[in-house]
Amino acid sequence: MRIALFGARGIPHTYSGTETFFGELAPRLAARGHEVIVYCRRSLFSRRPSSYRGVRLIYLPSVETKSLSTPTHTLACAIDVLFRDVDVMLVTNVSNAILCIVPRLFGKNVALNVDGVEWNRSKWSSLGRRYFYWSACLAGKICPDGIITDAAEMQRIYQEEFGTRSVCIAYGANIENSADPDVVREYGLEPFKYYLIASRLVPENSADLIIKGFEQLQTDKLLAIAGDANYRSAFVDGLKRTSDRRVRFLGHISNSDHVKELHCNCFCYIHGHSVGGTNPALLKAFGYSNCILALNTPFNREVVGNYGILFQNDPRDLAAKLETLERHPDEVISLRKRASARILEKYTWDHVANQYEDYFRRLVAGDSPAMDSPLGMYVPQHQELATTQVLSGPR
């Protein structure tokens, strides 16, 4: 198959989970003999190689502002792809739904990964949230056979709220171990002597709640916050006004090896994401064998299962859970040992690639996967064949 992917910043890029998703999925599809294109935002790449791990890269312009970067780049991609011999395209972000009309009018097969419930994100204006909701309403009408949700709860929301059937395919994660624990000392940290937040500093990721809970904890451990906002915000300024000297702001860290070491050597990873589906940052933490303490939401519960601890949307409850971990370090060790099993159970990137490959084949063949598949995680019709292709490499 000839497959095009767009809607993200491009690859290789580490800003968010969408770029990680493209960076993991596209090379795996290419390794199976498919011709894969990933579109990249030209202004974000000073170096512009023509390929990456067997994937062709195409750089197109965008207007780099908070509200215009995604739609302007997606529009450029949607027009460019019309002039290429592509069997199927994967577009991310529900805000791009309206732009999928362009390739759909020309008979192209389009799959739209709707991502999270963007209309609930406080970082957007009231007008922006209404636009996301309208896009979600429209998505199933534009791509009736091509809607992808990344969690069972998201699948339920789209069916009950918008009457839209979807295929549920989650994200994945790799299992990685620490290679150089001394890296954390470059950030003023000591291995297993700090708690970690690793996320964009936006209100729905709950860094304010986590800081308030941590401030109530009697411990000599630090709270390391790896991440920042893409744009200047009063929310971030407020976070940094904490008087607790144990709270350390590390800023955005683009070095993936450093991100890995910060994860692998933390005492506990605290995940405060309150909006969205299967969160790539949470899966990544499991892949790094973290002890996971996650905000209790339907999406987080779905991923965490019995492999981590949940806290309520209350600093006092978080403080109590932190205190329990402080008193029972053996529980931390036990959760760390079990974490990677969660990834192997259902969230490996090879499994995700199997699902997408099978799903794309069915779209190209004219099937209706969303209508034919039961609710819950998508099960490839040709799973054994797909696994064989992974093991045997390129065709």
Q: Predicted segment positions?
A:
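N-terminal strand-loop element at the rim of the active site
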Residues: A8-T14, F22, R28-T65, E153-Q159, ...
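Conserved donor-binding/catalytic core segment of Leloir-type glycosyltransferases
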Residues: A4, E186-Q218, A224
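Membrane-proximal helix-turn-helix segments that form the acceptor-binding/catalytic region
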Residues: L82, L105, G128-I147
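Nucleotide-activated donor-binding/catalytic signature segment of Leloir-type glycosyltransferases, i.e.
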Residues: V236-D257
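Donor nucleotide-sugar binding/catalytic pocket of nucleotide-sugar-dependent glycosyltransferases
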Residues: C137-D180, L189-F192, I197, R248
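An aromatic- and histidine-rich active-site surface loop
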Residues: P71-L82, V86-W119, G277
